[in-house]
Design a protein with these regions (language model features):
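Conserved alpha-helical scaffold segments that buttress catalytic/binding sites
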Residues: 1-236
Length: 236
C-alpha cells in the first residue's frame, strides 16, 4: 500500500555507480551536472567528490523539503526524504558505507535553503543537530541576499568549494509547475538566480545536482526554461 515502492539495495547500488562515474568525470576534467528523478542520487555525487580528496567541501541544499529524516523519524519511510541526513552520517549507516568515498558531511558544512514543508520530527532533528536553515519565507521577506548572505559568509570561512543541490520543488509551483511534490510559497526563479550567483561569486562549485523535474507537469515548458537559466547562473 505504500506510495513509495522501493528496494533499498538497488538504490544504493545506483548511488555507488554514480559515485564512481563522478570520480571518473572529475579526473577527466569534466564538470558533473547530475539530472536525477529524485534527490537520493546526491549521495552518489557527494561521495564521488569525497573520494577525490580529503579536503572538506560544503553542501548548499535548495529544497522545499528537509530531506533530513532518518528511519527513526520518517512518517512514510520515503528513502528520498532521508538523503541529506544520510550524507551527514545520521541514517542508513551500513548502507552508506557501501558507497565509494563515503564519509559523513560535517553539519557546519551544510546549508539548507528554500524549505517550507518539513515533517515535525525532521524539523526537530535539524534544529537539534544545528543545521543552518534558511526557509523560503525568510527569503521572501529579506530577499535572497539579505537572507542568505550571513550563512554563506560563515560557510566561506570554513570551505572554499561546494556541491550545489537544486530540487525543482523549491520553486513556486504556480510559476514553475514541473514537480508533483511542490507546495505553495516557493521561490521565484529570480530569487534563485540571485542566490546561485551569490554562490558562484563566493565558492568553487564542484558539482551540481538537479532533482525531481517532471516534464509531465510542465506542459508549457516554463520550468524547463527556468532550470536552464538557473544552471547558467550557477555554473556559467
Amino acid at each position: 500500500q505504500s506510495p513509495y515502492p522501493l528496494e533499498v539495495g538497488t538504490s544504493y547500488e545506483l548511488y555507488s555507480k554514480l559515485a564512481a562515474a563522478i570520480q571518473q568525470d572529475c579526473t577527466n576534467g569534466q564538470f558533473p551536472l547530475v539530472l536525477s528523478g529524485n534527490c537520493g542520487a546526491s549521495l552518489g555525487t557527494i561521495n564521488g567528490l569525497h573520494g577525490l580528496s580529503e579536503e572538506p567541501f560544503g553542501v548548499v541544499w535548495f529544497d522545499a523539503h528537509g530531506d533530513f529524516n532518518t528511519p527513526d523519524t520518517s512518517p512514510t519511510g520515503y528513502l528520498d526524504g532521508m538523503c541529506l541526513a544520510t550524507a551527514a552520517g545520521l541514517g542508513w549507516k551500513l548502507m552508506a558505507r557501501t558507497i565509494p568515498g563515503f564519509r559523513p558531511l560535517k553539519i557546519e558544512h551544510i546549508i539548507h535553503a528554500g524549505g517550507r514543508d518539513f515533517d515535525p520530527e525532521e524539523a526537530c532533528l535539524m534544529k537539534e543537530k544545528g543545521v543552518t536553515t534558511i526557509e523560503a519565507q525568510q527569503i521572501h521577506e529579506k530577499g535572497a541576499c539579505g537572507a542568505l548572505e550571513p550563512a554563506l559568509n560563515a560557510l566561506r570561512s570554513r570551505v572554499k568549494d561546494i556541491y550545489l543541490h537544486f530540487d525543482v520543488d523549491v520553486l513556486e509551483p504556480n510559476i514553475t509547475p514541473g514537480n508533483h511534490y511542490a507546495v505553495p510559497g516557493g521561490l521565484h526563479p529570480e530569487q534563485l538566480r540571485e542566490a546561485f550567483t551569490m554562490l558562484r561569486e563566493r565558492f568553487t562549485i564542484r558539482a551540481m545536482g538537479i532533482g525531481s523535474f517532471d516534464p509531465s507537469y510542465d506542459g508549457e515548458g516554463k520550468t524547463l526554461r527556468a532550470v536552464k537559466e538557473l544552471v547558467k547562473a550557477a555554473v556559467g
